[in-house]
């Protein structure tokens, strides 16, 4: 098993796979009673707390403790000011006012890739959020995460959810938000070929 997971770990690059390989190496060494190596690999997996195996690894080395996702880097004020003064940004806001913001998607992708080191991805995701296109912000953040740049604020949007509907308590907001992110990426107009609609992609006859 050790050789298998080492080979797996050495041949993947995306955080979700790196965390998986490291976690199972941690489990393998734990089974072999190599505590130091086990902790080493669990710690490596726990660097990727937005992944399932990263969270499992965190619980292995920090039983009973809660974790917090890292905050986004701070973008310098001068770069932020310059970014939001650009004509293309004004055009994106104009498209939003005309209810044609779907055409802004590729403009936002372009802006995101312009100056990554100075925070163009973060500002493009912020701009997408400003026009209520959380789905575009998530897509920008997802692409960044494949290169191990994590913009958690925009990759995991938080919107308000009711606690009660018709006197009935509904599930915790974290559970609801996770379903929305998976099913529609917070796209209010999402419609599937099968007929599912809305944020949670419900079928009309089950809604």
Predicted feature residues:
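Alpha-helical adaptor scaffolds
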Residues: 1-13
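Catalytic glycan-binding domains that act on GlcNAc-containing polysaccharides
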Residues: 14-17, 28, 32-44, 55-58, ...
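Helix-turn-helix repeat elements of alpha-solenoid scaffolds
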Residues: 1-3, 61-68, 96-103
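Structural signature of alpha-solenoid helical repeat scaffolds
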Residues: 13, 49, 79-80, 112
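TPR-adjacent "capping" and linker segments in tetratricopeptide-repeat scaffold/adaptor proteins
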Residues: 73-86
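Alpha-helical segment of the N-proximal tetratricopeptide repeat
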Residues: 86-103, 107
């Amino acid at each position: 098993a050790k050789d298998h997971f080492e080979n797996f770990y050495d041949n993947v690059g995306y955080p979700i796979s790196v965390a998986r390989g490291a976690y199972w190496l941690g489990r393998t060494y734990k089974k072999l009673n190599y505590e130091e190596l086990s902790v080493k690999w669990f710690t490596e997996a726990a660097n990727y707390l937005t992944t399932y195996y990263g969270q499992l690894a965190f619980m292995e080395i920090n039983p009973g403790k809660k974790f917090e996702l890292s905050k986004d880097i701070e973008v310098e004020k001068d770069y932020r000011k310059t970014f939001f003064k650009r004509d293309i940004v004004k055009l994106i806001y104009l498209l939003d006012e005309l209810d044609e913001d779907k055409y802004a998607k590729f403009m936002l992708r372009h802006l995101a890739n312009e100056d990554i080191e100075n925070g163009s991805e973060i500002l493009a995701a912020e701009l997408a959020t400003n026009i209520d296109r959380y789905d575009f912000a998530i897509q920008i953040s997802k692409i960044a995460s494949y290169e191990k740049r994590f913009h958690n604020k925009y990759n995991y949007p938080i919107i308000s959810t009711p606690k009660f509907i018709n006197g009935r308590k509904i599930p915790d907001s974290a559970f609801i938000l996770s379903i929305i992110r998976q099913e529609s990426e917070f796209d209010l107009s999402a419609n599937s070929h099968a007929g599912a609609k809305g944020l949670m992609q419900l079928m009309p006859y089950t809604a």
